[in-house]
């Protein structure tokens, strides 16, 4: 689940980078919905098994990618936004379809 964020790069435009990140996140959620749901349950329980990963590798990766977003903002390539919260919003949107598949199916009839 970290692979899509690792692919997020500064050497391409913000539009292309964010679009590609969203595409990759949607693919992971679509192709591995059970893993996404399991991760969601782990978070709801306070991350008893993954706290070290969250405060270690994940935090470092989010800090690294947030710096990329800040650089785009500083160079006028992206509207001002809190970089961490942008990443959180992308996570929320892309994982929603897997984590809440029952709700999505009930509402859309699909």
Where are these regions (language model features)?
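Amphipathic alpha-helical packing segments from all-alpha helical-bundle domains
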Residues: 1-2, 16, 27, 31, ...
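Hydrophobic alpha-helical connector segments
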Residues: 3-37, 83-90
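A ubiquitous short alpha-helical element
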Residues: 7-9, 23-25, 50-56, 110
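Short, low-complexity, polar/charged sequence segments that are solvent-exposed and flexible
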Residues: 10-11, 57-60, 99, 108-109
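Hydrophobic/aromatic-rich alpha-helical bundle segments in the mid-to-C-terminal region
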Residues: 36-38, 51-52, 70-110
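Short helix-capping/turn signature of helix-turn-helix
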Residues: 41-46
């Amino acid at each position: 689940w970290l692979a899509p964020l690792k692919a997020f790069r500064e050497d391409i435009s913000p539009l292309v980078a964010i679009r590609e990140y969203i595409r990759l996140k949607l693919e992971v959620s679509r192709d591995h919905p059970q893993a996404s749901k399991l991760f969601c349950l782990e978070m709801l329980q306070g991350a008893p098994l993954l706290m070290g990963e969250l405060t270690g590798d994940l935090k470092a990766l989010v800090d690294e990618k947030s710096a990329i977003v800040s650089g785009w903002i500083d160079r006028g390539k992206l509207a001002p936004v809190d970089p961490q919260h942008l990443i959180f919003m992308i996570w929320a949107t892309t994982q929603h379809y897997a984590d809440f598949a029952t709700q999505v199916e009930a509402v859309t009839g699909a």
